[in-house]
């Protein structure tokens, strides 16, 4: 999927969420939501590694699926933050990760 199209779809979804629940999707909300999602991803890692209470344990397949969903939430909220801050992430990736890099 095209990166910009993905970002547009995620932002539209976030805006729909805000409208449905009467929440203003602004920079404050997006940053705090990103923190929340990172925490949920960390919890999913603990569960995946069985470093949790026994009643929270899942099968390998279930925990891997939860990891993927929580990481998708982290990336999604990062994209919402980029949109709200008017940051071109494609250009930022190019400059930060790929420009003048060897190997």
Residue ranges: model-predicted function:
Residues 1-71, 75-103:
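Flexible "arm" and connector segments at domain edges
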